[in-house]
Amino acid sequence: MTVFSSGVSRRGFLRHSAAFGLAAGAASALRLPAFAQSGLPDIQSVLDKISVKDYVREDYRKLYKMSDDPLWDPAKDWIRTVDWEKVRSEQSGKTVRFAVGAADQESAAEGLKPFEQLSGIKVELVPIPDDSFYDKAVSEFISGNASFDALQFFSPWLGDFAGPGFLADLSEYADKWKLPLDDFYDTYRLNYGYVGGKLVGIPFDCDVQMVHLRKSIMEKILGGPIDRAQSVPSYDELIRVTAEANKLGGGVAGVGLMAARGFWATYTWEHIAAQAGLTLFDSQWNPQLTSDAGMKAMDIIMALQKNAIEGVSGAGWGENRAAWLGGQVAANISWQDSGTQAMRPDQSKIVDDFVTIYEPRISGGVFAPPNIAGSTSCVAATSQNPEGAFLMLAFLTTSSIMAMNEANANGVAPGYRSVLANERLRAVSQPMKVWADSLEHAWCAPRIPGMFEMEQALGNEINRAVTGQISGKEALENNAGSFCPAWRASGIWSTADIFSPSDINVSFSCMASYLRFVQPILVKGWKYSRHSNGAGVPQTFMSRTLPGRSKFVMTLGSKFASSAICDIGPEHSIIMPLASV
């Protein structure tokens, strides 16, 4: 999971062992001789170095006695099936500009050398500060002349970027270059790749949340070895056994879970609510937070937090990971990499003392392991070389590189069926069989504009419940009226009065207990213009004249921290603060 706007992400936390999707252990292998101006290196010689021997860390290879055999299916590994001679004939000498987090710039440059040698394309990196990646990307998109051709980002932002038309349709390139989309699990292909029926992304970091147990503790409580499907079949049983574990003492709490403010708490709620059959919206986009499924999840969270490690209300991924790998909890609700990393002695104190189980059930619910977070790879609609950008992203997400990321336990997860089915890789990734089985039934939050902001606001309220400020019911009720599209929440006009349903692509509002817009409404067909106002302040104007209507104008300040004014005809003006909640 990559979260550019927060202080801690799984990839950021492990930056020393990941090179923007490529393992740091590959650094020496990537230093191939620079290609001469008269020609490029031999293709096969470059591909031969993208191997287990050269990419997977030496200490891990020795620990697990790994052979040089591939951890992927070569017949489905895009870099080994694409026609690189054709790529060179069409793209050699061209340039692709790639937006990366500023802290990843050096590792990204190293990791992309093989692509440059295979394709003849020069990659220019456009560093963006990690804590302002979203705002910077949006402002560049709106300018109509983004400084980058491609970017990888947190997949919950996909709706924000795709809805207004900021991302290129990749379908033509995927067909031409035979990208193996059918090898991705449906949950990743559909939720990290497609928006409105168009392919706008290639899945990159493919996540699923899971439940992990400490064997030495839970086997005492359960009276024998842990059966991954039967020992803890329900959340009621998970509550019981973690309560028992909590009584054992010894500096080990019953359970770890993420309940920090913002999306962390929301993701825990979505994880559990999905098992109760949660549907976030009905067919009319009415929020379903206070449905039976939503309320049941809050009840379970409130029960589990009584058994949780101290400080759970401040736990995001980093804190949760440290507690689990440090042996401070008997059970953990987190991502799949909590299982892979727990196997690595340099990262974990619980090697050989844990097991990842199938998702516990809820009476009357469904089996719906949650695909939460993750990241995707996209091309800007304004790209100067969209085809070259696509080829670069296809290289970064190819199955061999993703498989070796998993072997290196760097938190960048593969989403390919052929990779997760590989028995050699399963031998070094304990959760993988349960993980692979679970993906056939995965649940995912919709990739709609503003979803991430809504999840942030909801998480703030859930955190208040966990800390005892309000009840679980109040946490959901406080967001029930605002967890909905801006055009419905405003109450000022109906979309039918201004736009046809096929005409509008909008961002969502993010509100806590009051109405507050944090993103502009963006509509297909807007015209963008930029000039200074009377005070000399640069402003961006977006306007559109609709048949039989007055011109619809939005004025944006020079920064997203300013306000926008929407004039709808001669009578209505709406001030829209754009600062984050």
Residue ranges and their predicted role:
Residues 1-12, 19-27, 32-35:
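N-terminal secretory signal peptides
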Residues 39-91, 122, 438-501:
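Conserved C-terminal helix/tail region of periplasmic/extracytoplasmic solute-binding proteins
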Residues 46-90, 155-210, 239, 353-359, ...:
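Hinge/lid segment of periplasmic solute-binding proteins
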Residues 53-72, 336-350, 362-460:
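C-terminal lobe and pocket-closing loops
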Residues 110-111, 267-271, 275-276, 295-385:
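Extracytoplasmic/periplasmic substrate-binding proteins
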Residues 113-185, 220-226, 323, 330-331, ...:
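Extracytoplasmic "Venus flytrap"/periplasmic binding protein-like
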Residues 117, 124-127, 174-175, 182, ...:
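Helix-loop-helix "hinge/cap" segment bordering the ligand-binding cleft or interdomain interface
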Residues 139, 146-149, 177-218, 361, ...:
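A structural signal for short loop-to-beta-strand junctions that line the ligand-binding cleft
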